[in-house]
Amino acid sequence: MSARNAASARTVACLLGPTASGKTAAALALAARRPIEIVSVDSALVYRGMDIGTAKPTRDERAAVPHHLIDIVDPADAYSAAEFRADALRLVAQIAARGRTPLLAGGTMLYYRALTQGLNDLPAADPDVRATLDADAARDGWPALHARLAGIDPATAARLAPNDSQRIQRALEVYLLTGQPMSALLAAPPRDDDAAAGLRFVPVALEPSERAVLHARIAARFDAMLEAGFIDEVERLRRRDDLHLGLPSMRCVGYRQAWEYLDGCTDYRTMRDKGIFATRQLCKRQLTWLRAMPERIVVDCCAPDATVRAVDALERVLDGRAPA
């Protein structure tokens, strides 16, 4: 965005951070001071019936402050970054038209990147191609498909773990549909599109000064989810004939581990440990994305007054007092 366009653009405050960094508390604290509406930037919160394992805002919290892009998709269906971008831009405009302030809040950095930087020419998901790849994985295993990917797109394969089924499948799907490696398509300039041209997104990032503190929070939160009935929630989902571990919804952190426990593949303690480890790995990826944003305003989420600091940073953004 040019300096002239930036000066005339409407500022949109964004509250980003890894799992368990205190985003919900900060967003609700800001809502006590300003007439905001929260637009979720979270790929897990879109799914209905997945409340405990996603740490979804409670009914009381959602009644107190309008929330958007929560409970909008059935777990049997997919929801893409392109759909998120279109929905978020529409909501930002509608909220502003009502005389209220939109606040984007969440930790799905792929969504945030799609929103702020536009979309590359990646094809939509193809159910037939995915079914074929799922069948191949069931027969040969995901490490074998990872090796297949390494032969056609070594750059993408190098950044994926051999058991990262969701991303391996997507990279192979893109190649099968386009004949081009995903890494090449992502390296191309995003499509020109003026849908967000009048907006200036300013990220406030909750990041830990001590990773051990965040890890302790993650463990405590996972234990609290288990106490709140997370296993029962997954059991209800597992009883549905149309849900399986290959779906994006069931790849959400914690759900796969609980499902495998219910299948008898692991014991309870192993399930808990794997769920916490997977959440920590997600946190690591989220922080990697955040630290690649030089424009972000960092708030230490380990500080005792982190919520107050985050609200102050967001208010400076909204009042035009943040660095341009």
Curated annotation (Swiss-Prot):
ATP binds at residues 17-24. One of its GO terms (biological process) is tRNA modification. It catalyses: adenosine(37) in tRNA + dimethylallyl diphosphate = N(6)-dimethylallyladenosine(37) in tRNA + diphosphate. Its EC number is 2.5.1.75. Signal peptide: none annotated. It is an enzyme of class 2 (transferase). The record marks 108, 130 as: Interaction with substrate tRNA. Substrate binds at residues 19-24. Catalyzes the transfer of a dimethylallyl group onto the adenine at position 37 in tRNAs that read codons beginning with uridine, leading to the formation of N6-(dimethylallyl)adenosine (i(6)A). This is tRNA dimethylallyltransferase. It comes from Burkholderia pseudomallei (strain 668).
